[in-house]
UniProtKB/Swiss-Prot annotation:
Name of the protein described by the UniProt record: Transcript termination protein A18
Organism phylogeny: Viruses, Varidnaviria, Bamfordvirae, Nucleocytoviricota, Pokkesviricetes
Motif annotated as DESH box, chain positions: 206-209
Organism: Camelpox virus (strain M-96)
Keyword ATP-binding included in the entry's annotation: yes
The protein's role, per its UniProt record: DNA helicase which seems to act as a postreplicative transcription termination factor. Involved in ATP-dependent release of nascent RNA. Forms a stable complex with single-stranded DNA, and to a lesser extent RNA.
Length: 493
């Protein structure tokens, strides 16, 4: 730990990484406070901040020669086989770590690698190279299985803990596995933090972007007060301010043969309203809609839009154009609505729900990986980050209010490299609720722009449903005619 006075140059360097956000650190009294410019107080500067050689310091950090926490079950022949691009990452990491050891810098590296790159297998390879006892920390239980599979493939002795840190601490009195796979809430226990700081050298923070380290979280406190000897942050969408805790980044672009298309499903809707909708519309401009809760609630009861989403999905699925579908909503009630309707159409052998409230969901996710055809309905919170179903070929985004980081993570669910190259994403920019029409259009346009400009998707308009259904075309025509008549009549008046 480094308690330092906040001099001007140090403050400037740290503040630069927050990208305009407030800078918050632990002070010498252990309080997590905002750092003001010109402050005369001392603050705990994270160890990982000094991993970048561009940060000048006279501090000297311990290297691995000071510990003896080595993996006993390591077998080099079990190291996973990597693609050339993954080997390039390993080479970069090894080269950077040699320089860090030479300069006596902390061995902290952020692996900023695209969704579908294979961060898990690449990191397991690095783990085998280092041969050091390791803690793998994941934000939720759903990510544990993919780590378990890769760690077992490497042949490492490991233990998974999801049932509570107290139980784990009792078990660690009689056993000392080479690899611990835990959920991040374990870090709220100081005794556990002290244990892994003493007995484990390598700490892997999976999906590091899910933690805002400018907040006083368990992960923030762990990295500040119990900093590991070595640390990897893994992410496809790094959070800029988290660099303060892990300031060395490796980012290698990945070329892909995937054919990625985002289909914009446009439709004209007559205004739709119910008592419930009118009640929620009154809350749109209030404080209760600060995070667009009511905007998404309105979308969940927008019956014409929901029917369009279902019609499009059913048509594409029945035609065989898409086979392994992820349907994403923002709200749980919206997820349940789609699940029930799809279940009635296709049955429980095809339709599954990714419900965070169901403890059996992770096991169900494992079981559907082998299916040739399925529809998986879930929420952005549960499946937007880290969902491990590599065979997904299509994504239906039913919500609209999604930030850039979530968009990139979500689209990454259908960008995993497999033998089948076609990937399709469907978005729905229209709504029948006129009070949110422009807002929804703008939010969906942001999804489209990011997918095309940053992730290499090709944008196309989806016309199949309207063209294949003559009654739909007639309905649209008559609707347009009525709208034109109203405009004409109002002008005459």
């Amino acid at each position: 730990m480094s308690l330092l006075k906040m001099e001007y140059n140090l403050y400037t360097e740290l503040k630069k990484m927050t990208c305009g956000q407030s800078l918050s650190l632990f002070n010498e009294d252990g309080d997590f406070v905002e750092v003001e410019p010109g402050s005369s107080f001392k603050f705990l500067i994270p160890k990982g901040f000094y991993s970048s050689p561009s940060v000048k310091t006279s501090l000297v950090f311990d290297t691995l020669t000071t510990t003896d926490n080595k993996i006993t079950s390591i077998n080099p022949t079990n190291a996973p086989k990597l693609y050339p691009i993954q080997c390039k990452v390993v080479s970069e990491v090894v080269s950077n770590m040699r320089k860090m050891i030479e300069l006596k810098r902390p061995l902290y590296i952020t692996l900023h690698l695209a969704c579908g790159f294979g961060k898990t297998i690449t990191t397991c390879y690095l783990m085998a190279i280092h041969g050091r006892k390791t803690v793998i920390c994941v934000p939720n239980k759903m990510l544990i299985h993919q780590w378990k599979t890769q760690v077992e493939a490497v042949g490492l002795e490991h233990k998974i803990s999801i049932d509570g840190v107290s139980i784990l601490l009792k078990e660690l009195k009689t056993q000392s596995p080479d690899v611990l796979i835990v959920v991040s809430r374990h870090l709220t226990n100081d005794a556990f933090c002290k244990y892994i700081n003493k007995h484990y050298d390598l700490f892997i923070l999976d999906e590091s972007h899910t933690y805002n380290l400018m907040n006083n979280t368990a992960v923030t406190r762990f990295l500040a007060y119990y900093p590991p000897m070595m640390c990897y942050f893994l992410t496809a969408t790094p959070r800029p301010s988290n660099r303060i805790y892990c300031n060395s980044i490796i980012n290698i672009a990945k070329l892909s043969d995937l054919k990625k298309t985002i289909y914009v499903v446009d439709s004209f809707f007559e205004p739709y309203s119910t008592d419930n909708i009118r009640h929620m519309i009154k809350r749109l401009d209030g404080a209760s809609n600060k995070y667009h809760i009511y905007t998404e609630k309105l979308l969940s009861v927008d019956e014409p839009r929901n029917q369009l989403i279902l019609n499009t999905l059913v048509e594409e699925f029945k035609s065989g154009t898409i086979n392994r579908i992820l349907v994403i909503t923002k709200l749980r009630e919206h997820m349940v609505l789609f699940y029930k309707r799809l279940l009635n159409l296709f049955g429980p052998e095809v339709v599954f729900i990714g419900d965070a409230q169901n403890r059996r969901t992770p096991d169900m996710v494992k079981s559907i990986k082998e299916l040739n055809r399925f529809i998986f309905v879930s929420t952005l919170f549960y499946s937007g980050t880290g969902l491990d179903i590599p065979s997904l070929d299509s994504l239906f985004i039913c919500s609209a209010v999604i930030n850039n980081m979530q968009i990139e993570q979500l689209l990454g669910r259908v960008c995993r490299e497999t033998a089948l190259l076609d990937r399709r994403v469907y978005v729905f920019p229209n709504t029948s609720i006129k009070e949110i029409k422009y807002m929804i259009g703008n939010f969906v346009q942001r999804i489209i722009s990011l997918s095309v400009d940053k992730l290499g998707f090709k944008q196309e308009s989806y016309r199949k449903h309207q063209e294949s259904d003559p009654t739909s075309a007639c309905t649209t025509s008559s609707r347009e005619e009525r709208v034109l008549n109203r405009i004409f009549n109002s002008q005459n008046r």
